[in-house]
A protein has these predicted regions:
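Short, basic/aromatic beta-hairpin or loop at an interaction surface
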Residues: 1-7
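Short alpha-helix capping/helix-loop boundary micro-motifs
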Residues: 9-16
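Loop/turn positions that initiate beta-strands
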Residues: 23-26
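Short, surface-exposed secondary-structure boundary micro-motifs
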Residues: 29-31
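Short, Lys/Arg- and Gly-enriched loop/turn segments at beta-strand edges
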Residues: 33-46
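Acidic, low-complexity, intrinsically disordered interaction modules
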Residues: 49-64
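Short, compact, well-ordered microdomains
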Residues: 60-86
Length: 86
């Protein structure tokens, strides 16, 4: 094994452009919901800059500190991709 660390990448929707940049260190707040399909989680980049989609419990983040690795701009929103240590 080469000692590489496993990372999870989460997509966040950011409705106001320019709040984050590639390379920014971010903290996320974890929230959970009980649904008919089971427990799901979603994450908000603090302080309310962007929000993730629903994440199944099996894919729950193990750390709440990450780094922005990519931002994709669309006409309606920006999509922020952040990686977190698994």
């Amino acid at each position: 094994m080469n000692g590489a660390k496993k990372m999870s990448v989460i997509e966040f929707k950011m409705e106001r452009p320019g709040l984050l940049s590639v390379g920014d260190e971010v903290s996320v707040e974890e929230s959970k919901l009980q649904t008919l399909q089971g427990l799901i989680y979603y994450y908000t980049i603090y302080p309310a800059l962007a929000m993730s989609n629903n994440i199944p419990a099996r894919n729950r983040l193990k750390t709440l500190e990450g780094k922005v690795i990519e931002i994709k701009e669309t006409e309606s929103a920006s999509f922020v991709y952040a990686e977190f240590l698994d």
